[in-house]
């Protein structure tokens, strides 16, 4: 069966892109990275794409509508069926988001709907929560909204600062994003309003990573 073609949009280091590249290196993984697009020419993620022979493009210095048109053209030429935002730090044109509705996903370093937007780790620490994590969701026009596909939970430990919490969450992101893309590629998801139902699995077995597992791995 042909693998799902994924287009990844990045702005920076591309560590979640690398997690998807690593997953797709397994020939049994049901998705492949067809193209990478960055809005910044200095994004380290472009080097990651180049090193593995993935077509990559820079679309910069354009207004929102022009950026959307150029990006949509690249995605179409690559035969992309799913767009994955991976550390992509530009707000997308509403028409573009609507055109890719239910075919575009994002990963955010908090347990949405808590702590959307910028500095979610800072928000989590200020709120005094005991657990944080990351969320993969289908993209909607409002920032960090849309039906939730999967979440990973990590503990907030005594003495954490933004950097230590971000590092713990990032490790979970690298596990969660390939899982979520797999679920999309295997057509195991059904959107019901603002909920995502996963065929053949009962949450939290598939739709979440267990906090005790993350706690144990963090201390190993």
Where are these regions (language model features)?
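Conserved acidic residues
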Residues: 34, 81, 102
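Donor/substrate-binding cores of folate-linked one-carbon enzymes
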Residues: 23, 86-199
């Amino acid at each position: 069966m042909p693998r799902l073609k994924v287009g990844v949009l990045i702005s920076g280091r591309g560590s979640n892109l690398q997690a998807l590249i690593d997953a797709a290196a397994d020939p049994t993984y049901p998705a492949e990275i067809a193209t990478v697009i960055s809005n910044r020419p200095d994004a380290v993620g472009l080097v990651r794409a180049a090193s593995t022979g993935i077509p990559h493009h820079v679309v910069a210095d354009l207004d929102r509508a022009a950026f959307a048109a150029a990006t949509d053209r690249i995605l179409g030429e690559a035969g992309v069926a799913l767009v994955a935002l991976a550390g992509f730090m530009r707000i997308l044109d509403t028409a573009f988001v609507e055109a890719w509705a239910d075919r575009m996903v994002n990963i955010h370093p908090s347990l949405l709907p808590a702590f959307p937007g910028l500095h979610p780790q800072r928000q989590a620490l200020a709120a005094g929560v005991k657990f944080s994590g990351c969320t993969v969701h289908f993209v909607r026009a409002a920032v960090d909204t849309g039906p939730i596909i999967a979440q990973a939970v990590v503990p907030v430990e005594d003495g954490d600062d933004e950097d230590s919490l971000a590092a713990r969450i990032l490790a979970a992101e690298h596990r969660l994003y390939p899982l979520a893309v797999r679920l999309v590629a295997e057509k195991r998801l059904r959107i019901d309003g603002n909920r995502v139902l996963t065929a053949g699995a009962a949450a939290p077995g598939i739709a979440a990573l267990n906090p005790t597992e993350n706690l144990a791995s963090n201390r190993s």
